[in-house]
Amino acid sequence: MKQLTILGSTGSIGVSSLAVIKANPDKFAVRALSAGYNVKLMLEQCLTFQPAYASMADEVSATALRQQLAEYGCKTEVLAGEQAACDLAALDGVDQVMAAIVGAAGLLPTLAAIHAGKQVLLANKESLVTCGRLFMDAVAQSGAQLLPIDSEHNAIFQSLPEQIQRQLGYASLSQNGVERIILTGSGGPFRETAVSALADMTPDQACAHPNWSMGRKISVDSATMMNKGLEYIEARWLFNASAEQMEVIIHPQSVIHSMVRYRDGSVLAQLGSPDMRTPIAHAMAYPERVTSGAKALDFCQIGALTFLAPDYARYPCLQLAIDACNQGQSATTALNAANEIAVAAFLQSQIRFTDIAAVNRHVIEQLTLPEPDSVDDVLYIDRWARQAATQILTHYAR
């Protein structure tokens, strides 16, 4: 029986993780849950899974949860704040930590799990986008094991030889016969929209992803393909890949989640229904296999799989991310932070869809900060980029 802490339990990955746990009650148990401000959903989760601990982002939410749990006679101990999330990530007796807190808020709790030597199921992109080298060094020093949750990275992981799986971030791709990692993306809801019409796209249109059910922020990132850009950066660190060993292609059906091309001409791919429960179940049970609850793939119903090269005029954020990755960790950190500010402004209808890339580009152009040597350095770059993006927003405000 594996004991888990779920960081970000009320988000879409957290909810899917709990669904997999519920489908396999003889294999997994919840020791601790951590979330932001969604008291209502956290209450339901605590009553269903009876964790020893739960944490909320602030004392107001924690107090509300505490009072409501007491009314039900639930014994879950409720904590508050970022340190509480870090403590729950490093709990004694916890085997696995699902790192699914979105954004820079997930950095320190994820790092706490790594330092504690846990098996870390990594769904927080920002950990590697902003702290790639720091995180991979910490993994090596602590003996922690990273298992990727993003459907693309999980697909790549499954398509790689075991020697690389066991030494993520350090094993040589070329020495293990790998020629190239092929990252696939659907192209989002605006794949066929005229580029001239993109400026008029609304938040609701951007969030209507054709294949995946996701949160609003990541849905917008899918529409701009910034999500694929962040995944590109993450894959470079996770699989120790050079720019020459990476390729991004559009695959509208989202059936092939990514591929690995080998020196002998073989290409290994992982296929499945677009359901996050599949990669979650794979990582939780690794190296075994368990029921995920995901629908089986019906090849006859799919009919055909198609592929396209990405159009960087349509997806300038993808190009920005690739360029930032080649520039360094300071640039990827700044880009990630600027993008969070720009997407939040777009979701509130303060700027146009095409302004997201413009704001991101301006922040990168203003960047003069050196490469980070610590998490504090990363957080400083993150704060600087957020302030710079907020200032730039005033020029685009509608």
From Swiss-Prot:
Pathway: Isoprenoid biosynthesis; isopentenyl diphosphate biosynthesis via DXP pathway; isopentenyl diphosphate from 1-deoxy-D-xylulose 5-phosphate: step 1/6
Annotated residues for binding of NADPH: T10, G11, S12, I13, G36, N38, N124, E126, G215
GO biological process entries: isopentenyl diphosphate biosynthetic process, methylerythritol 4-phosphate pathway involved in terpenoid biosynthetic process
Entry GO MF terms: 1-deoxy-D-xylulose-5-phosphate reductoisomerase activity; manganese ion binding; NADPH binding
Entry binding sites for Mn(2+): D150, E152, E231
Cofactors named for this entry: Mg(2+); Mn(2+)
Catalyzed reactions: 2-C-methyl-D-erythritol 4-phosphate + NADP(+) = 1-deoxy-D-xylulose 5-phosphate + NADPH + H(+)
EC number of the protein: 1.1.1.267
Gene3D superfamilies documented for this protein: 1.10.1740.10, NAD(P)-binding Rossmann-like Domain (3.40.50.720)
Annotated residues for binding of 1-deoxy-D-xylulose 5-phosphate: K125, S151, E152, S186, H209, S222, N227, K228, E231
Keywords: Isoprene biosynthesis, Manganese, Metal-binding, NADP, Oxidoreductase
Protein family according to the UniProt entry: Belongs to the DXR family.
Subunit record text: Homodimer.
Function comment: Catalyzes the NADPH-dependent rearrangement and reduction of 1-deoxy-D-xylulose-5-phosphate (DXP) to 2-C-methyl-D-erythritol 4-phosphate (MEP).
Protein's UniProt name: 1-deoxy-D-xylulose 5-phosphate reductoisomerase
Organism the protein comes from: Pectobacterium carotovorum subsp. carotovorum (strain PC1)
Gene: dxr
